[in-house]
Amino acid sequence: MAAIITPAIPQDLIDFLHKYRVFLIAGHKEPDGDCIGSSIAMSLFLRRLGKETVLLSAGPFQRPEIQAYEALFSAHVPDALKERPDEVGAIIVDCSGIDRTGDLAEQLADFPSICIDHHATNATKSVGSLVYADAPSTTFIIQSIIEHLCGSVTKEEAEMLFFGLCTDTGFFRHLDDRSGEVFAYTARLVQAGANPKYTFAAMNGGKSFGSRTLISRVLARMKPYYGGKLIVSYETDQDRQEIGVENRDSDMVYQLIQGIAGVKAICIVRQDTETHCSVGFRSLDTVDVSSIAASFGGGGHKQAAGLYIEGTVDSLIPRFVEAFASQLEAAS
C-alpha cells in the first residue's frame, strides 16, 4: 500500500472558503474527538481569515472527552442566516454528507456545501469537497488545508488537530509503516503548542466507576466465532439503566478484546432503544469492516466502522456473524 501523503488541496475548495462571509460547520451525529477537533480547528482557522462561523452538532455529546466542548455548538441554524443563504456556506466534516448530520440535515440542505472527510465509504463527488481515505483522521486533512493557505497552525488550532488525530489513531496505535508523514504533521502540531501528555490525560482520565462496570459486562458476554477470529458481544438498555451510565469507553473495550490471541475482528452491538441498535466493528490488518458496515447501511474505515440499524441484539448478531464469513473463512 502507498504511503500516506499530504493531500492536494482543490482550487474549488479554496474558492469556496473565500466566497462566503459566514460558514456553518457541522459533523456527524454522536460526535467523537475527530469530529469535534475538525469542527473547532476549522472554525478557528476561518476566523483567522476574517470569516464568521457557527459550530453545529446534533449531538449527543456522550463521550466524556468531548463534553467540555458541547457549549461551543448549537443544534440549530440561526434564523437570521436562513434569510440570507447567499452569504452562507456549509462545511461538513468527518462524514460523507449532510444526511449524516442527524437532525441538522434538513436545516443545512438549503445552503451550498462542501465535505471534508477521510472515511473509505465516502462517495462524495461535489465540487470543492476533499475526501482522502488514506488520511488517519479528518484533522489531518484540515491541517493540510490550514498549512497550505496560512503556512502554519496556531497553538489553539494545533491542540484541536492533535486531539482529533489522537482519537482516530488510538493515540497512534493504529498507524503503520506508511505513516511517516503523519508523524511529521504531529511534530509540527507539538511544536505549535499541542501537549501530548495533557491530551492523553484528557482522553483517558476521569472515567466513572460505572463505565468500568459496563465494560465488565460487555467482556463477560464475549462469544468467539470462526475459531476465535471474530469476537462478538453486546450491551442492553437495561445495563445502562442499572449502572447509571451512557458511555462504556468504547476504545478501551476494543483495545482489551484486540489483545486476545488470534482475534482478527470485533463486533459489539448496543441496544439503544427497543427497536434500534448501534453497532461498532473493529479489525486488525486484513479484515475490511467498512465493507461489512456498508452492506447494512453504515460506513467507516477498513479497520473501524459502524452503523445504526433497526433490530434487536438477538436478531442482529446472527446476521453480523454471517457477514464476516467470506473474509474470515477465507483467512482460515
Q: What does each of the following model-derived ranges do?
A:
Residues A2-E30, G37-Q67, E83-V88, T167-S295, ...:
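Hydrophobic helix-and-loop "lid/oligomerization" segment in the mid-to-C-terminal part
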Residues D32-D34, D94, D117, D168:
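Acidic active-site catalytic centers that drive phospho-/nucleotidyl reactions
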Residues G33-G37, D134-S137, E157, D249:
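A generic structural signal for residues located within well-ordered alpha-helices
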Residues G33-S39, I98-T101:
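Short glycine/serine/threonine-rich phosphate/pyrophosphate-binding segments
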Residues A41-S43, Q107-D110, V131-Y132:
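Glycine-rich, phosphate-binding/catalytic loops in enzymes
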Residues E70, S74-G128:
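Active-site cofactor/cluster-binding pocket
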Residues D79-L81, G102-A105, S129-V131, C150-S152, ...:
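A generic local secondary-structure boundary/capping motif
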Residues I116-Y185:
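Short alpha-helices
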